[in-house]
């Protein structure tokens, strides 16, 4: 049987699990997983609070998938610039897009664009060391407000309540 070549754009959990399922389902499948970042794992790496070691354990499972011979991770590749869909179609039998969420949802709140107002994605990316975010953050405010009651809002509130050395 002929080998099936598949490209996955996006090396977060969805892209890596897609590669895993495809190679298990189709014996002759080979998958290249591309990401614009130098390291894989997407929001599991760059979007989970550092004090969530159990969730970060998911990286171990994803690493096992990427270590298989039939799956290859290729980082620092920008879709649309370094690779285009016509190029991918010439070399692959199928292309899967799993590019994930890059930004916050726009909030219709007065003052949201004032200096000192930051979205969760930027702050979480900063404390997780995302390569697209500056290494410094203005931690000078005496009072902050965290809008939301979901997991990310709670993570941010917890991180802000910790001493800086933690």
Q: For the regions a protein language model found, what residue spans apply to each?
A:
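Rossmann-like nucleotide/phosphate-binding core characteristic of flavoprotein oxidoreductases
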Residues: 1-9, 21-32, 47-51, 83-86, ...
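FAD-binding core/adjacent interface of flavoenzyme oxidoreductases
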Residues: 2, 75-143
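Rossmann-like dinucleotide/flavin-binding elements
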Residues: 3, 9-26, 124-166
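Short amphipathic alpha-helical segments
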Residues: 20-21, 45, 107-111, 157-159
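Glycine-rich FAD pyrophosphate-binding loop
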Residues: 26-42, 166
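Conserved beta-strand segments of alpha/beta enzyme cores
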Residues: 30, 70-72, 116
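N-terminal Rossmann-like dinucleotide/flavin-binding domain of flavoprotein oxidoreductases
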Residues: 38-94
């Amino acid at each position: 049987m002929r080998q099936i070549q598949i490209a996955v754009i996006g090396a977060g959990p969805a892209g890596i699990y897609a590669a895993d399922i495809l190679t298990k389902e189709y014996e002759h499948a080979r998958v290249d997983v591309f990401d614009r970042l130098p390291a894989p794992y997407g929001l599991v790496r760059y979007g989970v609070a550092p004090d969530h070691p159990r969730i970060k354990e998911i990286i171990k499972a994803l690493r096992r998938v990427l270590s298989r011979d039939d799956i290859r991770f290729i980082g620092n590749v920008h879709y649309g610039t370094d690779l285009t869909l016509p190029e991918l179609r010439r070399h692959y039998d199928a292309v899967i897009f799993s590019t994930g969420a890059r930004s916050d949802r726009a909030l219709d709140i007065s003052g949201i664009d004032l200096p000192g107002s930051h979205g969760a994605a930027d702050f979480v990316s900063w404390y997780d060391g995302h390569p697209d975010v500056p290494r410094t953050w203005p931690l000078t405010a005496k009072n902050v407000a965290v809008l939301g009651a979901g997991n990310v809002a709670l993570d941010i509130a917890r991180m802000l309540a910790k001493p800086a050395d933690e």
